[in-house]
Curated annotation (Swiss-Prot):
It catalyses: 1-(5-phospho-beta-D-ribosyl)-5-[(5-phospho-beta-D-ribosylamino)methylideneamino]imidazole-4-carboxamide = 5-[(5-phospho-1-deoxy-D-ribulos-1-ylimino)methylamino]-1-(5-phospho-beta-D-ribosyl)imidazole-4-carboxamide. NCBIfam families: 1-(5-phosphoribosyl)-5-[(5-phosphoribosylamino)methylideneamino]imidazole-4-carboxamide isomerase, PRK13585.1. CDD domains: HisA. HAMAP family: HisA (MF_01014). The active site is at residues 8, 129. GO terms for cellular component: cytoplasm. This is 1-(5-phosphoribosyl)-5-[(5-phosphoribosylamino)methylideneamino] imidazole-4-carboxamide isomerase. Belongs to the HisA/HisF family. The keyword Amino-acid biosynthesis applies. It is an enzyme of class 5 (isomerase). Pathway: Amino-acid biosynthesis; L-histidine biosynthesis; L-histidine from 5-phospho-alpha-D-ribose 1-diphosphate: step 4/9. The gene is hisA. GO terms for biological process: L-histidine biosynthetic process; L-tryptophan biosynthetic process. Its main location: cytoplasm.
Length: 243
């Protein structure tokens, strides 16, 4: 099981939001590349990057910061936020992103996901962000009538590498992962699922492991790592023994 440390980029800085609200951003590091290096040095094997401005504007905004991170690390990175077309997907893959995450565009234009998976097999993930069980888009500003399961089912045969499932109501709030919903999703589909939103402590990871769900690839942690509530060495040691 993989623990992905999150670097959320706003105005070139490494921040954390609460419930996805841009006006509730806490700056944790004004040098994202240094933060990424620190995560690699701590033993993490895969980094999760989000261009927050890009998610709201529908196009890459923090490209310079992302490129500086990619230049600074030797471990793989996955990137989401503002990726709405094939040209942007191709650009990021060529620049060294291992896996591109399609969020809003996956909901509004599912054909893009299918085409991208065909063109770049194993390199495309879908980000499904839920508010009250419904899929939210446009940087979480719009909530649709679709359930996460409805949406995930559309990509069952597309060749999606992973689904990143975020519970917005918990994101950045340290309320604990929504393990029940994550397990339900992972059990219902064949695509690997990554849990995100609310991870608060090592206890969350223990509960995730205890759920014994083979469809869960890992979890994303942001604020708990920055706040020191989750010790990297303890967490990584726990997860390394789990397939």
């Amino acid at each position: 099981m993989i623990l992905f440390p999150a670097i959320d980029l706003k105005d070139g800085q490494c921040v954390r939001l609460v419930h996805g609200l841009m006006d509730q951003a806490t700056v944790f590091n004004d040098d994202p590349a240094a933060q990424a290096r620190a995560f690699e040095e701590a033993g993490f094997e895969y980094i999760h990057l989000v261009d927050l401005n890009g998610a709201f504007e529908g196009k890459p905004v923090n490209a310079a910061a992302v490129e500086s991170i990619l230049a600074a690390i030797s471990i793989p990175a996955q990137l989401g936020g503002g990726i709405r077309d094939l040209a942007t997907i191709e650009m990021w893959l060529e620049k060294g992103v291992r896996r591109v995450i399609i969020g809003t565009a996956a909901v509004k234009n599912p054909a893009l996901v299918i085409e991208a998976c065909r063109k770049f097999p194993g390199r495309i993930a879908v980000g499904l962000d839920a508010k009250g069980g419904r899929v939210a888009t446009e940087g979480w500003a719009d909530v649709s009538d679709l359930t996460v399961l409805d949406m995930a089912g559309r990509f069952e045969d597309a060749g999606v590498a992973a689904i990143i499932y975020t519970d917005i109501d918990r994101d950045g709030a340290l309320q604990g992962l929504n393990i029940e919903a994550t397990v339900s999703l992972a059990d219902a589909i064949s695509i690997p699922v990554i849990a995100s939103g609310g991870l608060s402590s090592i206890e969350d990871l223990k509960k995730l492991i205890a759920a014994n769900c083979s469809g869960i690839e890992g979890a994303i942690s942001g604020r708990a790592l920055y706040d020191g509530r989750l010790d990297p060495s303890e967490a990584l040691k726990l997860l390394r023994g789990v397939a």
